[in-house]
């Protein structure tokens, strides 16, 4: 049985679960028209589908815990999913990281982490959660939309001068106290 709970200091090593590969099979193309965000989906051809993996982080629980909350999804004692929420200046708590072990994807673990994150954000006085996803990580973008997030912005400059140049970050917002 999967349980979702806040990760305390005694379980601090759980915040460093390994990143695992995910497929790149399309791109979300947002546009802002008439005061409303819309998007199109560009699917890659089968031969252009690829897989990528983010570098592993080395999160320091003691340093981050001053302004972060860690949420873990557990199968028994094994942490198989992680959400990191960070304090933010405005009314939306920032979902800094969200990841689920490859063997558990498609089993609603990410949604369970979002649900617990919503509880935490409300308890801390936020009206919602925001996060960002790369436009070419179509699986993540569609996941956020499926879980009630809406597009709230587009950063087309963030990767300029890096190996990721040409990509954009889509900002997603979830209102939870409507």
Question: What residue ranges belong to the model's regions?
Answer:
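Extreme N-terminal starter segment of soluble prokaryotic enzymes
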Residues: 1-3
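Acetyl-CoA-dependent GNAT
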Residues: 9-10, 17-92, 96, 101-102, ...
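Conserved acetyl-CoA-binding loop-helix of GNAT-fold acetyltransferases
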Residues: 100, 106-119, 142-146
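Conserved GNAT acetyl-CoA-binding A-motif
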Residues: 121-133
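C-terminal "cap" of GNAT-fold acetyltransferases
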Residues: 134-137, 147-150, 157-178
């Amino acid at each position: 049985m999967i349980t979702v709970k806040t990760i305390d200091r005694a379980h601090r090593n759980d915040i460093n679960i390994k990143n695992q590969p995910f497929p790149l099979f399309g791109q979300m193309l947002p546009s802002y028209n008439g005061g409303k965000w819309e998007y199109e989906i560009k699917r890659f051809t089968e031969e252009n589908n690829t897989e990528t993996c983010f570098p592993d982080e080395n999160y320091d629980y003691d340093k981050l815990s001053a302004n972060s909350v860690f949420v873990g999804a557990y199968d028994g004692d094994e942490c198989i999913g992680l959400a990191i929420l960070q304090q933010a200046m405005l009314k939306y708590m920032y979902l800094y990281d969200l990841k689920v072990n490859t063997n558990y994807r498609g089993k609603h673990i990410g949604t369970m982490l979002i649900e617990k994150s919503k509880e935490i954000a409300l308890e801390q006085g936020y009206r919602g959660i925001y996060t960002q996803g790369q436009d070419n990580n179509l699986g993540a973008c569609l996941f956020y939309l499926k879980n009630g997030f809406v597009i709230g912005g587009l950063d087309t400059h963030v990767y300029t001068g890096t190996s990721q140049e040409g990509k954009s970050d889509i900002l997603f917002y979830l209102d939870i106290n409507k």
